[in-house]
């Protein structure tokens, strides 16, 4: 259907192109000779043969005098104590030191533990931006297949998986076909099965 509309509009354009403005068909000229075409007024130069505004020459950058200064601080190499406390190892940090953020008077503090608290605080902003986490995928899977546990097999009282129905999936089990969530933004079905 779309192709026929496209073809019809193309034929209409060809028919309109064949007609001139006063309704007469366009006379095709002889192939040997073409009529002279006058230049557009925008393409005409001044009588001197130069453009009306002077074009400045290109400026060449001199790199032989040294590299340009950049605002990016260099890589900071800081000593890092191991949790055992005996040896000191060097590590490279790509982030600027604490004096760059809060001034030279700020004391340097290393995290007391190298475990989850140091990494969780640093990765919290990225975790907050993540929309499709592991928990969301699990919830979505339970909403899509609420009768997943009905099949035989697996451990425990049900079958299939070892998880119990919780939250929205448990509420949706008794409703039948109405009110099931269709997607993650909260649209629910109002139609039957």
Swiss-Prot record:
Cited Pfam families: ANP
Q: Name one GO biological process term.
A: regulation of blood pressure
In alphabetical order, the GO MF annotations are: hormone activity; peptidase inhibitor activity; toxin activity
Expressed in which tissues:
Expressed by the venom gland.
Q: Which domain of life is it from?
A: Eukaryota
Q: Where is the composition biased (Basic and acidic residues)?
A: 125-150
Q: Does the keyword Phosphoprotein apply?
A: no
Cellular location(s): Secreted
Q: List the disulfide bonds.
A: 177-193
Biased composition range(s): Low complexity: 95-123
Name used for this protein in its record: Bradykinin-potentiating and C-type natriuretic peptides
Compositionally biased spans, kind Gly residues: 152-162
* InterPro entries per record: Natr_peptide (IPR000663), Natr_peptide_CS (IPR030480)
**Keywords, alphabetical:** Cleavage on pair of basic residues, Disulfide bond, Hypotensive agent, Metalloenzyme inhibitor, Metalloprotease inhibitor, Protease inhibitor, Pyrrolidone carboxylic acid, Secreted, Signal, Toxin, Vasoactive, Vasodilator
Q: Name one GO cellular component term.
A: extracellular region
Q: Where is the signal peptide, in residue numbers?
A: 1-23
Chain residues in the propeptide: 24-27, 40-43, 58-64, 75-169
Q: Which residues carry this modification: Pyrrolidone carboxylic acid?
A: 28, 65
> What lineage does UniProt assign to this protein's organism?
Eukaryota, Metazoa, Chordata, Craniata, Vertebrata
Keyword Secreted assigned to the entry: answer is yes
């Amino acid at each position: 259907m779309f192709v026929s509309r496209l073809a019809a509009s193309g034929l209409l354009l060809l028919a309109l192109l064949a007609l001139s403005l006063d309704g007469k068909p366009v006379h095709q000229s002889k192939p040997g000779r073409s009529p002279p075409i006058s230049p557009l007024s925008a393409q005409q130069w001044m009588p001197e043969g130069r453009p009306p505004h002077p074009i400045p020459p290109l400026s060449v950058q001199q790199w032989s005098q040294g590299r340009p200064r950049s605002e990016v601080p260099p890589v900071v190499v800081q000593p890092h104590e191991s949790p055992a406390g005996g040896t000191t190892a060097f590590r490279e940090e790509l982030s600027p030191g604490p004096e760059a953020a809060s001034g030279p008077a700020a004391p340097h503090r290393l995290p007391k533990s190298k475990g989850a608290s140091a990494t969780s605080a640093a990765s919290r902003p990225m975790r907050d931006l993540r929309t499709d986490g592991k928990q969301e995928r699990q919830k979505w899977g339970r909403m899509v297949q609420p009768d997943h546990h009905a099949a035989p097999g697996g451990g425990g009282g049900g079958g299939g998986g070892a998880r119990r129905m919780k939250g929205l999936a448990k509420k949706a089990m008794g409703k039948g076909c109405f009110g099931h969530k269709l997607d993650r933004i909260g649209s629910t079905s109002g139609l039957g099965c």
